[in-house]
Regions:
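GNAT-family acyltransferases
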Residues: 1-95, 160-172
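A short, internal acetyl-CoA/4′-phosphopantetheine-binding micro-motif in the GNAT/acyltransferase core
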Residues: 68, 82, 95-106, 134
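Phosphate-handling substructures
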Residues: 197, 239-297
Length: 372
């Protein structure tokens, strides 16, 4: 699962119409109620209604987010976050209203979407979040409790339906952990020693982009492969943040054997494709993708355990990073690797709730030809 909360913009009109069309055809109620406003086909009016955040005639200001599945490029649901509670919302409604489109229910989206919504509540300075659901809606209750919800009581709403009131104390829930993986800039491929291979002059110039991308990001720590090209790629950014770079041998690139990189740009049954087809296979003297993945994930899990709620940068390599992405999204394969092989620089942002991946998003890349 790879999701993100987004504000509605004209670029997302197809995703909106797809989701709302399914909901309408199902003859089930739209949820949250905030997305029911007007006819969604009148997009400009619909959007203007969603963008009302100022208090109007006693109306509590709110923020509406749609849940985008980044892998499938579809809306799977939406959340409505009220900035504070009036007397009515304190009884029924709460801070967060949420809903998942009919075809995507019972897949874990609601739990993950609420987790991201809680981070938006944290940004608004809400220390304790109230969520409510109908007593007979077992799925909603489970999603709320999965996010730390504690049942306070049950009340009868204005429709005569029993409703459960849950409180979520954000002080008891660490913020999400954000990891920026930075694949190194272009390196001197003719330099055969993998550990000491430097960046090209162009690669050194490109490395300034890392600091620019992270300029407004409050980074807590920098980690890196011990290989020079990765260290040099994030050095300017670490210096700009006044932080040291902590190296971890497990974050190094795959050990290449005989003709290990043959076939990076070729078709056919090359060593590259054999490795991606069988994570246990490697060329003589080389390292399998399974071994690379195991040590990189081991290092990442330890870093996540020690840095919960923090923002981190990890300097990495093309193959090493690809095995990490494959671990969390097994569909990531050889063609995905070939798509990014020339991206030197390449920055991917992953967010985690503890050890659980919430989102994975490509942030920035520079296309530089891979040197065979």
């Amino acid at each position: 699962m790879n999701i993100k909360l987004v504000k509605l913009t004209p670029a997302y009109r197809p995703q909106l119409e797809d989701m709302m069309g399914e909901w309408l055809a199902s003859e089930q109620s739209f949820s949250p109620c905030a997305i029911r406003k007007n006819d969604y086909h009148d997009f400009d009016r619909y959007l203007s209604q969603l963008e009302r955040t100022k208090e109007e005639s006693g109306r509590v200001p709110d923020s509406v987010f749609f849940c985008l599945d980044l892998d499938r490029d579809i809306f799977v649901g939406a959340v409505n976050i009220r900035h504070y509670l009036n007397e009515d919302l304190l009884q029924c409604g709460g801070h967060i209203g949420d809903g998942i489109r009919p075809s995507e229910r019972r897949k874990g989206y609601a739990t993950a979407m609420i987790r991201l919504a809680l981070e938006e509540c944290r940004k608004l300075g809400i220390p304790k979040v109230l969520m409510t659901c109908d007593k007979d809606n077992v799925g909603s209750a489970k999603s709320i409790m999965n996010n730390g919800g504690v049942l306070e009581n049950e009340v009868i709403n204005e429709d005569g339906v029993w409703e459960q009131r849950y409180w979520i104390d954000l002080e008891r829930i660490p913020p999400v952990t954000t990891v920026y993986f930075v694949r190194h800039c272009q390196s001197e491929f003719s330099h055969r020693d993998d550990r000491t291979r430097p960046l090209t002059a162009l690669g050194m110039e490109d490395s300034a982009a890392v600091a620019q991308v992270l300029h407004e990001t409050a980074v807590d720590a920098f980690y890196c492969s011990p290989y020079r090209r990765s260290l040099d790629t994030i050095a300017k950014a670490a210096q700009a943040h006044g932080l040291p770079i902590q190296t971890d041998e497990r974050l190094r690139e795959r050990q290449s054997g005989e003709d290990g990189n043959f076939g990076l740009k070729d078709d056919g049954d090359t060593p590259l494709r054999k490795r991606w087809r069988d994570f246990g296979w490697c060329e003589p003297g080389g390292e399998s993708l399974g071994a690379v993945q195991e040590r990189n994930i081991q290092a990442l899990r330890e870093i996540l355990s020690e840095s919960r709620g923090k923002t981190l940068v990890i300097g990495t390599h093309g193959t090493a990073l690809s095995t990490v992405l494959n671990y969390y999204r097994p569909s990531f394969g050889c063609e995905d690797f070939l798509r990014i092989v020339d991206w030197m620089l390449y920055i991917v942002r992953l967010t985690f709730d503890g050890q659980r991946l919430l989102t994975s998003e490509e942030i920035f890349h520079i296309d530089r030809p891979y040197q065979k």
